[in-house]
């Protein structure tokens, strides 16, 4: 089980690592994949299945070899029939971090930031497990109009590419509203997540 302090520290570390990558690849788009899982346990078979499906889906779109994890329908295989892909590999860098505070994956692509966001939103919206993935696309300091060395990145919002905000897993309200109001119980969310995983995996 992860404490709140551990979770907050992991978020700070993630932001710091994003800054490091933005400094290293100032003219590219940075993608950060995490898993949305309720409760204090952030690393288990569910989170890893979702994470590796996300890694495979991102590699399928932008290029690369994927996670190598075998799932029935391979999650990304289900998605690959519908996903739009770039015609050649645009992946400059990728990294996976399997942490107790939650799986993290980073991808640097030489695709314009708004196009990268559009492609990542396609994964979130059409992949069988996409609603359990949080795929952030971050502008580099140069892409944000800042100077290299400023140590800042800025996320691209869905509204910038004309998409509505993400919807709740259990109802049609904006997910943010349900999270703030604690509209649904953790048990309800976990049951929904389990049913989504059981629909496409061997677990």
Regions found by a protein language model. Name each.
Residues 1-64, 90:
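General detector of N-terminal leader/presequence modules that precede the first folded domain
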Residues 18-22, 95, 157-158:
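Short beta-strand/turn micro-motifs at beta-sheet edges
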Residues 28-30, 35, 50-70, 90-131:
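Interaction interfaces in information-processing and related assembly proteins
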Residues 37-42, 111-113, 174-177:
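A generic structural motif
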Residues 68-70, 87-89, 145, 151:
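A cross-taxon signal for low-complexity, glycine/charged-rich
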Residues 128-142, 152-203:
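Cys/His-clustered metal-coordination modules, chiefly Zn-binding fingers
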């Amino acid at each position: 089980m992860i404490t709140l302090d551990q979770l907050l520290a992991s978020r700070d570390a993630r932001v710091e690592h994003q800054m490091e990558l933005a400094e290293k690849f100032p003219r590219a788009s940075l993608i950060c994949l995490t898993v949305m899982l309720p409760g204090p346990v952030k690393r288990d078979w569910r989170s890893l299945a979702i994470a590796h499906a996300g890694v495979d889906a991102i590699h399928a779109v932008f290029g690369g070899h994927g996670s190598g994890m075998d799932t029935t329908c391979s999650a990304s295989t289900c998605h690959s029939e519908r996903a739009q892909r770039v015609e050649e590999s645009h992946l400059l860098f990728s990294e996976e971090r399997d942490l107790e505070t939650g799986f993290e994956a980073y991808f640097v692509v030489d695709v314009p930031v708004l196009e990268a966001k559009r492609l990542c939103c396609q994964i979130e919206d059409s992949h069988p497990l996409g609603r359990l993935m949080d795929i952030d696309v971050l502008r580099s300091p140069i892409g944000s109009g800042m100077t290299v060395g400023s140590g800042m990145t800025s996320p691209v919002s869905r509204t910038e590419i004309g998409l509505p905000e993400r919807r709740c897993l259990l109802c049609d309200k904006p997910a943010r509203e349900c999270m703030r109001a604690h509209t649904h119980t953790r048990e309800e969310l976990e049951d929904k997540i389990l049913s989504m995983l059981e629909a496409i995996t061997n677990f």
